[in-house]
Amino acid sequence: MAVDRRPIDQMVLDVGGDAFQRLARLFEEETRGVVVALGTLLNDQDWRELGRQAHSLKHATSSFGLDDLAAIAALIEGAADAHKGAEAAVQLARLEAKADADLAELDGVLKTIDA
């Protein structure tokens, strides 16, 4: 299972099911947008912004229990900091493939949470 339920369960306790559902939907939308943006930043060799966006994605995905995505984002961040375009491209391809699957799994988890 790619989704660690512990941070999700804690957020539901903290903000309630309805608010969490809204936050999670926004997170899914934003994550998909960031993944696309990372590709553009890599193509533009905008290392600083690529690293910044990967860093933000790392923390956001970790907050929603998507630790595999967070780990890949950390690798992209490191590659960007070192200006290693080939390594960033490899990790971005992994991120793109994994994001679709993990976000679909998160969507399934959301269906189990009472709003």
Whereabouts are the PLM-identified features?
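Two-component system phosphorelay core
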Residues: M1-R52, S56-A115
